[in-house]
Amino acid sequence: MNVITCRHYEELSEKAASIIAETVKQKPDAVLGLATGGTPEGVYKELVRMHRSEGLSFRNVTTINLDEYAGLSPEDKNSYHYYMNTHFFAHIDSRKDRHFLPDGRADDLDAECGRYDRLIQTLGGADIQLLGIGHNGHIGFNEPGTPFESRTHVVELNEETRQANARYFPSIDQVPVKALTMGIGTILSGKRILIMASGKSKAQAVKQLLDGRISEAFPASALHAHPDVTVLIDEKAAGGD
């Protein structure tokens, strides 16, 4: 693992964006594996700035997202479809038909997971996969105990994860109880992985990730089996004040 420590969140976001931008410049038809949540927001903001100010084009890029809530329509403001459109897709020159996310409204969620995983395999996996990390080491919605060889699947969201995401919803009761997520094996099929952590609240998870012990009890530890992982953290996530 290559660990890069940045001074603060803004620098962290700029560094992550520069790595993704370099991937696109080297391979204009790159497959970008994307994540949602608070941590990547600054990355998308910087990529949009680079598109507008520096001419970075996403015209030939394909995107695949990690996950989506079950039961939410793409127009729902809490769906990850809506998040991606709001923070990124609506502001760049990419093609709408090249953005792929799991369909949380599918009649058969298990079949949808199989379809999505086959799509990712057909695309050859992500050229670069962006990840965040949960306090318990979850990546995507892969909670502790998820097999490392898992493929895209339906997951029951545990109480800790629902509480962590409750700030985006009017109440905890409205947080979905299920989601569709790339499995750990699917994530590991990416050619390069970029995992980000920001803030003191993520310091313990970062410490556990970097101590090198591999266990399904800490999903992010699976990344030690991947040959090209960059860990981007700010000073607070590194354990500093």
Curated annotation (Swiss-Prot):
Catalytic residues in the record: D67, N136, H138, E143
Annotated metabolic or biological route of this protein: Amino-sugar metabolism; N-acetylneuraminate degradation; D-fructose 6-phosphate from N-acetylneuraminate: step 5/5
UniProt xrefs under InterPro entries: Glc/Gal-6P_isomerase (IPR006148), Glucosamine6P_isomerase (IPR004547), NagB/RpiA_transferase-like (IPR037171)
Catalytic reactions of this protein: alpha-D-glucosamine 6-phosphate + H2O = beta-D-fructose 6-phosphate + NH4(+)
Superkingdom, natural source: Bacteria
Top-rank EC class of the record's enzyme: hydrolase
Hydrolase among keywords: yes
Record GO cellular component, one term: cytoplasm
Extent of the signal sequence: none
EC number(s) per entry: 3.5.99.6
A GO biological-process term: glucosamine catabolic process
Keyword annotations from UniProtKB, A to Z: Carbohydrate metabolism, Hydrolase
GO molecular function per UniProt: glucosamine-6-phosphate deaminase activity; identical protein binding
CDD domains (alphabetical): GlcN6P_deaminase (cd01399)
Role description: Catalyzes the reversible isomerization-deamination of glucosamine 6-phosphate (GlcN6P) to form fructose 6-phosphate (Fru6P) and ammonium ion.
Family the entry assigns: Belongs to the glucosamine/galactosamine-6-phosphate isomerase family. NagB subfamily.
Protein name: Glucosamine-6-phosphate deaminase
Species whose genome carries this gene: Bacillus velezensis (strain DSM 23117 / BGSC 10A6 / LMG 26770 / FZB42)
